[in-house]
């Protein structure tokens, strides 16, 4: 399994917590590598540790905002979308990680309201 998958071995196929499998301890150690954020990269003890590191990362937050943009706009972002992404990130942050604030920021932006049609 990959270094990001091993931490989730602490849960079985049904999502139940476990410490052993066939009477042997489950290895839940993993590693975040090549994330683009040196503070994020490194070993993790288990899924909880990994989730904590991801939750504290501004880079992960920015990736989340970018993926929300792609979903709601139905397209990939361009350089011209930087102000929309920055405003969405600001709304998300200022509202304590509110998905509602993020979506509202995106769907009220000019990029969403004034779409162009390609022939």
PLM region descriptions:
Residues 1-59, 65-69, 82-94, 104-119:
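Active-site substrate-binding loop specific to GH73 endo-beta-N-acetylglucosaminidase modules
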Residues 72-76:
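Core structural elements
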